[in-house]
Design a protein with these regions (language model features):
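Conserved small/polar residues in nucleotide/adenosyl-binding loops
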Residues: 131-138
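Extended, subdomain-level signal for the structured scaffold at the beginning of enzyme domains
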Residues: 1-127
Length: 138
């Protein structure tokens, strides 16, 4: 059986535009699908609008929201390093994946909607009848 290739798209926005309030990726919305894909042996690519490091919503790190799985990943230096080196959406826009997942967090409201590379990725996968999802579909 061929290995499935999954693209996990995460936000690069770490602050709300008009107020002094931090945001970013909601950690558990990433760790759960990441863990499931990793356990199944999928090839995982993590990308963000600009590439590079991504902010984590500090509220998602509070004990009330940080479940055991997410806490274990957050405490793993290799996992944290991976989050510091995401590919840019432009880098991966020409590739086809079996599944594209848009991870949540309020930051995504600001850098996903108008991102042309992300729009092209979603349209291309839709046109090819491949799967796309966002955190609300979990």
């Amino acid at each position: 059986m061929d290995i499935l290739h999954i693209l996990l798209v995460v936000t690069g926005t770490g602050k709300y535009p008009n107020i002094d309030l931090k945001t970013g990726l909601w950690l558990s919305e990433f760790t759960h699908i990441y863990h499931g894909a990793k356990e199944k042996g999928y090839s995982i690519t993590v990308a963000s609008p600009q590439g590079g490091g991504i902010p984590i919503d500090p509220v998602s790190l509070k004990p009330i929201y940080l479940d055991k799985l997410s806490r274990n990943y957050w405490n793993d230096p290799k996992f944290r390093d991976m989050l510091c080196h995401t590919k840019s959406l432009k880098e991966v826009s020409g590739q086809l994946f079996n599944f594209v997942y848009l991870a949540g967090g309020h930051g995504s409201m600001f850098d996903f909607p108008d991102n042309l590379a992300l729009q092209a990725i979603i349209k291309n996968h839709y046109d090819c009848l491949l799967y796309t999802s966002d955190a609300a579909d979990e």
